[in-house]
C-alpha cells in the first residue's frame, strides 16, 4: 500500500513541476503555439516510466507541432524532474494527447443542437432547462 501512495505522490509532484517547466523552463517555441494543460500523469509502479497526458487548445496543425516540441523537450524535462524531485533515476517521460476535453465539448454541442431542434418543434418551451442537470 505504501508503494501506491508513493507513486501517487510522485505523479502529483511530476504534474506540478512539469506545469511550472511548461511556463518557465521549456524554450522550444513549438510548445507555446497552443495552450497546453496537463490533465493527468501516470507513473509506473517502479517509477521508471511516466505518461503525461496533455490537452492542447488550438488548431490541429498547432497541436501536432506542440506534441513534437514536447517530445523533443522530454530529455530536458526528465533531467529537470530528476534534479527538482531529487530522484536517483528520473522516470522516462512520454507525452500523450488527451482528447477528453474535445469529446466533452463535442457532446455539449450535440446536446445544444438537440435542444434547439426540440424547441423549434415546440416540444419544450424556450429557455427551459430540461436538458440541464439538477
UniProtKB/Swiss-Prot annotation:
Cytoplasm: present as a keyword of the record? Answer: yes
Any one Gene Ontology MF annotation carried by this entry is:
ribosomal small subunit binding
UniProt keyword terms in alphabetical order: Cytoplasm, Ribosome biogenesis
* Pfam families linked to this entry: RBFA (PF02033)
PROSITE patterns with a match to the protein in the record: RBFA
User: What subcellular locations does the record give?
Assistant: Cytoplasm
Q: Which InterPro entries match?
A: KH_dom-like_a/b, RbfA, RbfA_dom_sf, Ribosome-bd_factorA_CS
Task: State the function annotated in the UniProt record.
Answer: One of several proteins that assist in the late maturation steps of the functional core of the 30S ribosomal subunit. Associates with free 30S ribosomal subunits (but not with 30S subunits that are part of 70S ribosomes or polysomes). Required for efficient processing of 16S rRNA. May interact with the 5'-terminal helix region of 16S rRNA.
User: Matching HAMAP family, A to Z?
Assistant: RbfA
Identify its protein family. Belongs to the RbfA family.
Q: What is this protein called?
A: Ribosome-binding factor A
- Organism for this UniProt entry: Synechococcus sp. (strain CC9902)
